[in-house]
Amino acid sequence: MSAERVDRFELQFEYFQKSLARLKEALAEDETSFVRDSIIKRFEVTFEMAWKTMFRFLVDKGERIAPKAWDVIPVAFQSLLIPEAAPWDKMREYRNDTSHEYNESRAVEISAFVRSDAVFAFDRLQAEMLNRT
């Protein structure tokens, strides 16, 4: 790996870790509509940082993939960066939903998913990245 690529991965991984920490700050609060909106926004950012971190890691390992979440997630699964693709596919779906419209019942659903599944998947990715670097 070139020094530039290593630096780009390390920087992207740092962004992911920081965004995950900020997401957890929001999750620690009692949920109100304001906190729910914060959770969703921080989820959006963390998801973006997560798949971009996986992309940087995989490219640095020689994978040739497009820089798009729907291309990165299957390769990350095949490379065992993530143990399951299903939660990541759901995260991608929710991320797309939050970008295009606001629906209160959907926001409650997404927030619950972030609490129950997404943060666990993010934690597992972080642990795997720390283990591999």
Annotated model-derived regions:
Residues 1-133:
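Solvent-exposed interaction patches of small proteins and small membrane subunits
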